[in-house]
Amino acid sequence: MASAGSTARRAGSGSWHSERGEGRGARPQPTPHGSMQRANKVSLKATWTDAESKQPRPSEESDQTTIDQTAIRSYYQLFAAAVGNVEWLRFCLNQSLREIPTDYKGFTAIHFAAQRGKLACLQVLVEEYKFPVNLLTNNSQTPLHLVIHKDNTTVALPCIYYLLEKGAALNAQTCNGCTPLHLAVREGLLDCVKVLVQSGANVHAQDAMGYKPIDFCKIWNHRACARFLKDAMWKKDKKDFACEMRKMKTLKSQLALMEYNYLIEYQKEHKILREAAIRKWLHGKLHPGHSLVSNTKQARATALSKTPEQRGSQCSSSFHPSVEARLQCIPQPTEMPKPIYRKSTIKRPTMWNVSNNPARPPTTKISHSQGIRLGVHPDPSPEHDFSSFLEVRPDRHGGAWLHTVDGHWVAPVPRLPFEVLLRMLYPHVRPYRMKVPQGFYPISMREVPRKRHLGDDTFWTDTLAMNLRDTFDEAFLAAVRSHQGLPALPSPQINP
């Protein structure tokens, strides 16, 4: 017992000495029992601290609750728009008026309503809560894209009419370049295709792969849509071509005015240069009687003495016309007279002459104007040729660049093919149907193009004989094989 007590006292004194030693700066090794207790205290303290840190604070609790309520409310709003419950949708929208909630795909309430064809929800969202009709998803889809679906065959048309009335983008493209017309054609919805085309959809729009709506008709074998689109594309092309031709007519009148002004300035400059050259020549001569004024008056008198017929013939007969001749050839820009509307008079048809006597009125008139051209040269083109004033260059898009001789570029140029622009601006280079007398020459049948040329190794006689026969007997087949150089077929052996 004494040893045990002394041992305990030594342990206690050792512990006390160790604490005092720590106070003095000495650091003896601690006992194992003290280290275990100290470790347990530290671990308990750390556990309690972690629990305190994990326990939410009151402010964070309120924020998390608000976020959860907002997410649930937005989910209810999207679900109400999808099922078409208008009252539930109004209740959810009245609770969140700050921003438009979306899901992970970027869909909002108007997208879900359009995807399910809920017209009442669309009207509430657009008219009462001012949702934009061209709101985009993450894939750049608009409500007009989503309403065109094969499941909405019966409800798609009213929704399309409503969205178009509210200003929906008719040719909006998704991230793949698809327009609403592409989707309607792919689904084979002919009524939707008609509504979109009649509203002004671009029938030549291309997606990211370069496909047009008519190409989707061919891929999915929608013949009715293809037939309608083909007719719409033809009408669109003709309308655009007529519009561009009207622009071309206006451009030609502007070019004629530009050429006229250019030739006037060119004539003035050359007149000044000629007078300066004549004055220099006269100063170099030793004839004082020659004066510039008399020569100028004489030249003007000579020019004025020419008749208009002689001036017109000079324009057409000269191979290199002068500036004056070119000015006479340019049609003068004149203002169109205002149309005068007169009251139409009703004329009764004349009575038929029932008499056989041609001398009695009304006398029969059988003469008519000469309609056959007797000349051998083609008639001159009534259109003005701009080849001496304008240069036409093709561009890489199939159109043309117009450049004048005085260094100006003409813009804008009508969107017409290069061949059409060249034919309209250079009518003199237009090929004629037949040039007389070069157009009259004999044509041999050997020069007529054929599908294939029959050579010596072609047995066309055998083919003709086979087409003319009704049955192929053994004798005929043997003759054909011998003609072609083939061995005869062995005769069939009859089994006894």
From Swiss-Prot:
Biological processes annotated in GO: cell division; mitotic metaphase chromosome alignment; positive regulation of microtubule polymerization; regulation of mitotic cytokinesis; regulation of mitotic spindle organization
Keyword Cytoplasm: yes
Disordered as annotated region, ranges: 1-66, 292-320
GO cellular component: cytoplasm; spindle; spindle pole
The keyword Nucleotide-binding is assigned to this record: no
A Pfam family this chain is assigned to: Ank_2
Compartments where found: Cytoplasm, Cytoskeleton, Spindle; Cytoplasm, Cytoskeleton, Spindle pole
Gene3D superfamilies the UniProt entry points to: Ankyrin repeat-containing domain (1.25.40.20)
ANK repeats: 105-135, 139-172, 176-205
Basic and acidic residues bias spans: 51-60
Post-translational modification: Phosphorylated during mitosis.
PROSITE patterns recorded: ANK_REP_REGION, ANK_REPEAT
UniProt-listed InterPro entries: ANKRD53, Ankyrin_rpt, Ankyrin_rpt-contain_sf
Assigned keywords, A-Z: ANK repeat, Cell cycle, Cell division, Cytoplasm, Cytoskeleton, Mitosis, Phosphoprotein, Repeat
Its biological purpose: Required for normal progression through mitosis. Involved in chromosome alignment and cytokinesis via regulation of microtubules polymerization.
Subunit structure: Interacts with PSRC1; recruited by PSRC1 to the spindle during mitosis.
Protein's name according to its UniProt entry: Ankyrin repeat domain-containing protein 53
Gene giving rise to this polypeptide: ANKRD53
